[in-house]
Amino acid sequence: MSVINFTGSSGPLVKVCGLQSTEAAECALDSDADLLGIICVPNRKRTIDPVIARKISSLVKAYKNSSGTPKYLVGVFRNQPKEDVLALVNDYGIDIVQLHGDESWQEYQEFLGLPVIKRLVFPKDCNILLSAASQKPHSFIPLFDSEAGGTGELLDWNSISDWVGRQESPESLHFMLAGGLTPENVGDALRLNGVIGVDVSGGVETNGVKDSNKIANFVKNAKK
């Protein structure tokens, strides 16, 4: 497994995050999203209800088994004790852990034995991306997002792409991108240097609720 292909996806990775209903999860699966994300950080507006989390997990596993298509449940955490993360991983059947705090992704990966997506903030965390490129860790994907994450704040894509292009081996730098993505701009995001996947939450919502049409259009535009 490599940083790019541990999910088994042959194209760009598409993650729909902040799911809070089985209906939205079913839409994401039917639209061919690769990764379904649930917020496991307490007291956030998109924090998942435990009952719904288990139902979404069952949907992901049933879809994977029936279709043979790799789909994964991603649990999003932020500066939570490893033991608490492990408890929810086991309870919800989480496949991939996404870390949005100051955690050491290596420590959590070793403790949990799971793939990790690590949120990076540009430009302060560029050294983590460079280190990952040189070490080629297994089952690890960097993710550029805003400091808070889930705010819909549009990142400075051009600065990130320009920075990648200036590096000694730009072809070795791969990461997912989040922050302000929508069905309308996701195609442009995937054409930037280094981007191998996209992560959306608010960009597929209407009045704070996941919108099936927006989810379907986002995935379609990302995959075409």
UniProtKB/Swiss-Prot annotation:
User: Mutating residue 48 to V has which effect?
Assistant: In strain: CLIB 556 haplotype Ha2 and CLIB 630 haplotype Ha2
Gene3D superfamilies, per database record:
Aldolase class I (3.20.20.70)
Matching entries from Pfam families are given as: PRAI
What changing residue 172 to R does, per the record, is: In strain: CLIB 556 haplotype Ha1
EC number assigned by the record: 5.3.1.24
Pathway listed: Amino-acid biosynthesis; L-tryptophan biosynthesis; L-tryptophan from chorismate: step 3/5
Gene Ontology, cellular component aspect: cytoplasm
What is the uppermost EC class here?
isomerase
Q: Which keywords appear in this protein's UniProt record, sorted alphabetically?
A: Amino-acid biosynthesis, Aromatic amino acid biosynthesis, Isomerase, Tryptophan biosynthesis
* Gene Ontology MF, one: phosphoribosylanthranilate isomerase activity
Q: Which reaction does it catalyse?
A: N-(5-phospho-beta-D-ribosyl)anthranilate = 1-(2-carboxyphenylamino)-1-deoxy-D-ribulose 5-phosphate
Q: Provide the GO biological process annotations.
A: L-tryptophan biosynthetic process
The family database entries (CDD domains) matched by this protein are listed as: PRAI (cd00405)
What SUPFAM superfamilies does the record tag this protein with?
Answer: Ribulose-phoshate binding barrel (SSF51366)
Q: Which residues cross the membrane?
A: none
Q: Does the keyword Membrane apply?
A: no
Q: Which residues form a coiled coil?
A: none
Q: Which family does it belong to?
A: Belongs to the TrpF family.
Q: What else is known?
A: Present with 1850 molecules/cell in log phase SD medium.
For this entry, the protein name equals N-(5'-phosphoribosyl)anthranilate isomerase
